[in-house]
Amino acid sequence: MATSSSSLPDPYGKPNECILQLDGPDARHFLQGQTTADFQKAPVGATVYTAFCNPKGRVLADALAIIISDDTVLLRGRKPVMEALSAHLTPFLAFSKSALRATQWTVVGSGPSSGLQTEPVSAQLIEENDAVTAVVINRGKGFIEYWQGDASVIQPDPEDVVPLARVDFETARARVESSTIGAYLPQDLNYDLNETVNFTKGCYTGQEIVARLHYRGTPKRRLYRAIIANISETPTPGDGITNAEGQRVGSIVNTLPTGEQLGVLIEVTPDSTHGPLLTREQGQALSSLEACHPVTDQSMG
């Protein structure tokens, strides 16, 4: 790992990622009522995966949060998604003793490294002059995610840098894109299976819908990883996926270009995975289908 007194230069910083900073004595309380995660019980330095939903339980934004202190929380997400989220939260912040602002922090992934723990751990906070200037996050499977402020003192080796999209793909972490804001229930993205949703924390926007599906319903779709070989046209997140009969059974969630192949995270009905799947718009076949998490609910029936 190399070190520097300057911030990460291009091509390290990825403008598609944005970090918001929530400050104030009500920061945790505000997030407790707006997101699917339990911010009240999480300790300082914890990594908290969470989602913001609308009243219908649809996901407006996903975020990886780091609790910097009792009064400060950083939230990382796709830049256009976080911009829309900031506008959505503005009316609610008027009644909270907290303020939300965009930062100039950069985000980059690195790995995989066989020397790292396979399971994620709490974030490492890097400080200068009593201020947090960088965050190092073990994403699991040998991948690291770095967040860096203007005056940071740490950066990864350039040879180890990988797109954050690869980190998300390899660790099966579905992301909300600008074209899929409000499109999915948390269960469609397996957020109920990877600790993004806490079902005991109490009320939050959309909680009634999300909890009802968890306790009384059957998730219709689940998250899978797949490959599209010899791509002629790259599908867009939100594009449909069909079975051999042309029936829509799900959609593209995220994409990862890898040369002539395209890695994709998709949400589809579990029953449809027993037969051929095609991209609806391009008619391209999906292969190497793999469930992102073990699914034990009744949706497998």
Model segments located where?
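Basic, glycine/lysine-rich polyanion-binding surfaces/domains
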Residues: 1-301
